[in-house]
Amino acid sequence: MDSRCGVCKYIISDCERYVSDNTFYHVKCFICKICKCELPPCFRGKHASLMCGDCEIKLNAPKCFKSHFPIHSVSVVARNKEFHNNCFTCISCNEIIKGGFQYSDELFYCSKCDIIKPPPLPPPLIYKAPIATSKATTSITSPLPTKIPILSTANLIPPLSSSSPLATQISPKTSTIATTTVETTTAETTLPSPFKISQLKNSGDNIYSLSSPSSSSSSSSSSSSSSSSPPNTFNKSSDFLRNPLNNNVKSSSSSIGGNFVNKSQQQQQPIDSCSKSSISISPSSPRPTEDDIKEQVFLLQKQSVQLQIQQQLQQRQIEQLNKNQLGVQKPLNQQPQQQQQQFKPQSPNLSNNDTLDSFSNLNQSLPPPPLINTTTFSNPLLKTKNQSFPTPPTSHIIKENQSQQIPKPSSIDEVDQLPLPPPPITPIPSPSSSSIIINNQQQQQQESQLPPPPPTSIIIDQSILLPPPPPSTEILPQQQSPKLYKPRPKPIVLPPPPLDMEQLPLPPPPLLSSQINQSLKSTQHNQTTSPTIEIPIPPPLPIQKQSIPTRKPQLPQSSNPSPPSPPSPQPSSNIPPLSPKQQQEQQVEPIFSPTGSIIPTPPPPPPIFKMKPLRPQKFRAPTNYIPSLSLHRANKLSNSTEDHIKPPESLVLESSRIEKFEPTINGRKLTELLKHQTFDDIVGEVLNKRISIYKQLVKDDVIFGDVIAAGASGKVYKGIYKGRDVAIKVYSSENFCFNIDEFDREVTIMSLIDSDHPNFTRFYGANKQNKKYLFHVSELVKSGSLRDLLLDKEKPLLYFTQLSIASDIANAMKHLHSIGVIHRDLKSLNVLITEDFTAKVIDFGTSRNVDLAKHMTMNLGTSCYMSPELFKGNGYDETCDVYAFGIVLWEIIARKEPYENINSWSIPVMVAKGDRPTIPADCPSEYSKLIKACWTDKPKKRPSFKEICDTLKKISESLTLKRNKK
């Protein structure tokens, strides 16, 4: 049959033609249309075109998003971007991403690395200098960067007030020169920092200079003579710029900005005049360079540092002086007249000009007055606010005002009758001062409780001398006089009289081995719940009660005296008195030796330990597991009898706080609805009609703790809800997988599933007040997931324990499939293990009904737990959960990760080919058959979870029979 060539369209014969994709070609035409290479006879072209494999890949194959090279075979698709297997790496750790990943700003991060975003940099600080005009003054509105203190005599004097305003102005060079005086009450002024002053250089054509007059009176005259006084300005040739801190500083004059001020004159001025120094900024003809300005600022800073050092040295000297010598401030003239009249003497012997130089022997009951610091006080009785206290006096002599008088005694007998001078009034400092605050009420109480002091003062030369005050300035409480304790008399020990050995009773013989064996046999019938120690007590012996002799010691007589009995010990007040029967049992007659000493009684036989009989430990725990009662459950498993074990009352109260919440839909429970509807229809009705079937929690009732785990949709926190440890899963809008519909579906499914089932965690409720911050609360299992338990090789797992864990998972999945729910994400990470090795299945966010799952394609889940039909695009059904359970069974027996050291994006290819993890050689045959039946390629041949539960039950029963035979 003749046909035409697909390339040249000529008719070809049967002997010289090739067929590809139902198209005939000549031999010479059957070549690649791009590289013109010969194609093999069995070539099958893609896209109905004649192209070799290399050319096909170059034109039609997808390119890697990272390397931009074509992808030949297996590729990784993430976020609609294709990668090579080796190119899909984490940006942070540069490792191949296996499993989950995080995506942010078109960058991929592995689940182990956090998305690190550098914090935004703060805006740069730019100092904007004002632009000077020719006919108007401009003021600095923006705050200056730094504060540089200027050397002035005001630094050596305490400031008058800390709230004095500080104003600065810069005036340009004009016809009418204006200067602004800056009053520095705190001895500081603000100037630009050295690295910002260079910006002032190009701010305008005007030139500014800094000058400081000698006093406040000269500041007014500086404005009129600033234009014609070059000494007040500074330039390169100024001595102030060259070396303001030279040897001339040590003399009596100091240089400040080119003006010389006499220190002696300045110190003699009053406080108001010498505490103010003016700084005028006026224009000048020469233009200072940038180096001059930097040099000037450096010298000013150096000058201020030296001044601060001097002030600190002075302050330390004053503090050291105050510690060694206590200075007392005298009362002032501003005191009220009534208070001054109280201290006036009644004797006219002393005149008004007489002064009191010193006191002596003040009352010891009064505490020493505190040191008055050199700070400003608000008490009007001491000083006004505009005055400052001088430095504390170096001597202890307190001088009185002339208005106060003290009578002069006419004789020595009248010395004791003179009234003592009143103590100085202690000021109440302001909150900003650092002086000691005296509690007047406490001082008055101490004075009222003390007796009147004895007259111990002595007047010498019309003055009263004081003893040196204590070095400490703190107010100490009055020391009480120490109590005198008399030594206790030593007890008189009387030697015992000689004893007659014939009258002494003999000690009981020790127990024989036969008696001990009889006591052992008699105690075997008394079984208790805990180990007990039984010590046999010898039979009591009669004792003769005798009182302790109180007579004086006498020589022993030759007659046969009765042996004195030792004194009976008196019981303490804490020990309850014994009954007469108990006293008779405990009384044992002592045995005396010929010398009079007491012979010790023979030691009792060794204690007899009676251990409880061992019973096999129960493996399965009760169904109603409560995590807060884990200690109680552990004790219940360790003890043999369970009747004597009761949970603490506090735990019972905590568990009774949370009432069981049974969800209802239109007044009907889930069991009633499942008779007429499927589970998916019920969930769809709840979500569409927005019916709230779960308990609404208040955020204040939940206490959040540390983060336990984090995933793509949110984080899991450890918390407390009504006295019980809970797990709080938070869904935040910040996560890229956040979806409110998924949250509603998961909460609805967890509410409908029976929370009392032993293999599910208990669900307490959810909170949806904040749409961007949702969370639900469930039971906390502290032991962790099944994967953590399996990978921890230090914890041994018996085969019976492994079977029990597998049975719990199968029972949970059997309950889900019975109501028409498939889990769809069953894996070892979604199985929690309690302290008694009970398995609990969690994470129902991806659960769907069987009917809907048939029309769904694969878009979620972990690749190593997914069945082969999912990679072919088939629907998800119950058999997919069975395949995942087969992988979990292999993990339990092998205690390894499935497909270890293999890229997760290459696992689908291996699963589709039929590659499965290798079953260990020591795995039992029945268990191995169950694993192979669960992960077979044909879904119809996989067993159901009901059959799996029956198989595991038979395996465990056969294992117990083998144990009992042994």
UniProtKB/Swiss-Prot annotation:
**Record-annotated disulphide pairs:** none
Q: What class of enzyme is it?
A: transferase
By its UniProt entry, which PROSITE patterns does this protein fall under?
A: LIM_DOMAIN_1 (PS00478), LIM_DOMAIN_2 (PS50023), PROTEIN_KINASE_DOM (PS50011), PROTEIN_KINASE_ST (PS00108)
Give start and end of each Protein kinase domain. 702-959
Q: Which CDD domains match?
A: STKc_MAP3K-like
Comp. bias (Pro residues): 419-430, 490-511, 561-570
- Annotated EC: 2.7.11.1
Q: Which SUPFAM superfamilies match?
A: Glucocorticoid receptor-like (DNA-binding domain), Protein kinase-like (PK-like)
Q: Tell me the InterPro entries matching this sequence.
A: Kinase-like_dom_sf, Prot_kinase_dom, Ser-Thr/Tyr_kinase_cat_dom, Ser/Thr_kinase_AS, Ser/Thr_Kinases-Pseudokinases, Znf_LIM
- Where are the catalytic residues? 825
* Catalysed reaction, written as an equation: L-seryl-[protein] + ATP = O-phospho-L-seryl-[protein] + ADP + H(+); L-threonyl-[protein] + ATP = O-phospho-L-threonyl-[protein] + ADP + H(+)
Which amino acids does the record list as binding ATP? 708-716, 729
Q: What superkingdom does the record give?
A: Eukaryota
Pinpoint the LIM zinc-binding domain residues: 3-62, 63-120
Q: GO MF annotations for this entry?
A: ATP binding; metal ion binding; protein kinase activity; protein serine kinase activity; protein serine/threonine kinase activity
Keyword check for Nucleotide-binding: yes
The Gene Ontology biological process terms listed for this entry are: signal transduction
What cellular-component terms does GO give this entry? Answer: cytoplasm
Presence of the UniProt keyword tRNA processing in the record: no
Q: Where are the stretches annotated Disordered?
A: 208-291, 331-588
Keyword list, A-Z: ATP-binding, Kinase, LIM domain, Metal-binding, Nucleotide-binding, Repeat, Serine/threonine-protein kinase, Transferase, Zinc
Indicate, by first and last residue, each region the UniProt record lists as having compositional bias (Polar residues).
Answer: 232-269, 374-389, 513-526
Compositional bias of type Low complexity: which residue ranges? 211-231, 270-284, 331-350, 431-449, 543-560
Sequence similarity: Belongs to the protein kinase superfamily. TKL Ser/Thr protein kinase family.
**Protein's name in the database:** Probable LIM domain-containing serine/threonine-protein kinase DDB_G0286997
The species this protein belongs to is Dictyostelium discoideum (Social amoeba)
